[in-house]
C-alpha cells in the first residue's frame, strides 16, 4: 500500500487528490490548516475511509513526516 501526505487536503485541488488516492487504496495523511480556503465538510467523506488520517496543522509546523512514498503539496491560499 502506498503512503502519501497530502497538504491542503480540504481545499479545491487537494481534496481531489485526496479522493483519488483514497479510491486507489492508498493510505492518506491529509494535512490542512483549515483556513477560509478549506471545506471542513469534506472530512465527513474522507473519514469514511479506514486508510485516512487527518492532521490539522500548518505545514510550517510539521516537525517530521513518517515513512511515506509521496508528499503532494496543495497547501496555498489565493
Residue ranges of model-derived segments:
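N-terminal Rossmann-like NAD(P)+-binding domain of SDR-like oxidoreductases, especially those catalyzing
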Residues: 1-78
